[in-house]
Amino acid sequence: MATNWMRRTVMVAACASAALLAACGSSTTDSELTPDRFIAFGDAFTDVGQKGSRYTVNDGSVSNWTQQLASRYGKTITPVASGGLSYAAGNARITAKPDVAGDATTLTVTEQIDRFLAGGAFGANDVVFINAGASDLIAGMAAVRAGTTTPADMVASARKAGQELATQVRRLV
């Protein structure tokens, strides 16, 4: 049953992302992007193996969206745990602890950004990925199903998580 809910959540997120992208329309190229580095923050959808495995097929035959974009520019993106610049971790929430699986050691997106900013800065040709919120929604729905929160409170928590993510994005620009 939880799998069906997760599948629906992923489909809604994918459709919303596609609609947002389609709304951008077309444009002309002023100057071609030539990125030096790819840096990522987020949850399972952006995780490239922070804890040893990814939230996809792990035989190397499938790349997630960050790996696909980096490869289009002849670059790679690897987890911080392996010396790279992808801070994203599966089950990470935006600011709340523990993560959606109950692991208090998983860095929140806020903590991921804190770690990067404590040891580095963005360059003019860096590409930054940030994707989060699914784990917050899953935790909220689990609380509703467990009877520990109301649907209205879950919606309010989701709105707050969205505002917290916007705050983190503003730190990056």
Regions found by a protein language model. Name each.
Residues 17-18, 53:
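Alpha-helical transmembrane segments and their juxtamembrane interfaces
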Residues 2-5, 24-173:
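Conserved active-site regions of diverse hydrolases
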Residues 7-16:
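Sec-dependent N-terminal signal peptides
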